[in-house]
Amino acid sequence: MEKMSDLPRELVEEILSRVPVKSMREVRVTCKTWNALSKHISKAEAAREGEFLGIAKKKFCRNSFLLFSIPWLRVLIVVDFSNAMKDAMKDAMKEIRSSFQAMRLIVANYDIATLSAFGEEQLAVLFQPFEGYVMEIWVTTKIEPSAVSS
């Protein structure tokens, strides 16, 4: 298992930039390095607002939309979850399912799971339980269509 200190600085910055603003206090008190990085990241966060998929107790975090942004595929799909958009949402989800393999992020209560694309062939998943000061981070080394990890 990789430690946060073993990851490249760019990847750590990318992961920490995806942490919700409400959770930044916990990040800053975790260690001195994270504190320094989070201060640097928070300055640029306004420009990055919304570039994540966050799930918390069956509700979608911030602005109640899903944003799929994978630069090397040039895909950007925004789905509004209001009642008037249910049909459009179903169509968009069909399009997403046909383009991507399903990835289930199962979270309980107010836990948060964040999916990030990093570089051209890496994905990072950050899991943060509601209670406690623990973050789990999984990073792929290469994205393969037939590769499955548990």
Curated annotation (Swiss-Prot):
Residues 1-47 form the F-box domain. It comes from the Eukaryota. CDD domains: F-box_AtFBW1-like. Pfam families: F-box (PF00646), FBA_1 (PF07734). This is Putative F-box protein At2g33655. It comes from Arabidopsis thaliana.
